[in-house]
Amino acid sequence: MKKSHLKYDVIVDYNKILDSYRLVVKNTEHKEKLVKYNLFLSSNLIDIYNELNSKCYYHGKYNIFLIKDPKYRIIMSENLKDKIVNQMVSEHILKPVIEPRLIDSNCATRKDMGTKHAFNLCKKYLLKLKRENKDIYVLKFDIKKYFYNIDHDVLIDKLKKIYVDKDIIDLLTNIIYSSNSSYVNKEIDTIINRELKKDLSCYHKEELKRVPRYNYHKGLAIGNVTSQILAIFYLNRIDHLIKEKLSCKYYIRYMDDGIILDYDKERLKYIRRVIEMELAKEKLELNRKTNIYKVSNGFTFIGYRFVLKDNKLVIRIGNKVKTRIKRKIKYLTIHDKEKLIKVKASYYGYMMRADSKCLQYKLKIK
């Protein structure tokens, strides 16, 4: 595919900034944060336009905090100005150019895709393969600390291959480098140490100690809208290699998790070695969880447990997801009954794809 001749001067437009602001507002859960910003809305949006137009925009500091869902994770929240710029970059620079280059089975965070599309593909592939009544194997791979290990320079080189305009590259570089500042790891250390002082189990303390830090010129800020699309794009070369050069028809990737289905276990072993070599070129490596399984013994992907029993496909909710759902519902039942209704509706959509009537009844989800 040819390089994009998208122009920075065309992208930097007040109406695009205004549209991006509206998208940010729509996706902001705590609306009280917007009150002060909205008092001087026109002035704030004009300031963003002027900074971008004069090419002196610089990504600000993150508000860094810890969540547990179910594991401890660091989230890096942007101020409103940076959120609006990131939204504009995502909608008008990244998506129009990157989306057409992605394979159909790269499912995470994309419009009309997500877990539903990944689930449907996995189910479709398994139903097709089981017709031959042969043993089916799955190579299930996981990339080690994916978001934290994405190499900035490798990513920027990839972007230079698809964007001609230097000002666009400079803006993307500015956003990508925003996790390089020394305060980021200091903030994370402070948050972790504060949490460790609480009355926690040994398990949770060990889990906290394993929360990653950012190495210089490595990692994307977790929470940025641009980080999501840059992360699904980073492995695009390998996605095409797996589908086209290795001729893996039954391949699905969901961010840092991937599966390849095949009748031939030895072929999957070879493919695994190729993936390991190709990931090394991207300065990444596979997690220890990566393995090859017989589908009749079952495997878990995107939270579902897929098993072939007597050549019949059985799909259930995975144990980890089941535990997370139970904990969430228990917490919201006590603390936020209004939100509980919305969460249950969301879980119902997720559960109805699997054999989960007993679980739905037990948790009163319908």
Regions found by a protein language model. Give the residues of each.
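Conserved polymerase palm-domain catalytic core
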Residues: 130-255, 260-274, 365
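Glycine-/proline-rich flexible loop or hinge segments
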Residues: 23-35, 65-76, 103-105
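Non-catalytic, polymerase-adjacent accessory regions of viral genome-replication enzymes
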Residues: 1-46
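Active-site-proximal segment of RNA-dependent polymerases
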Residues: 3, 7, 92-151
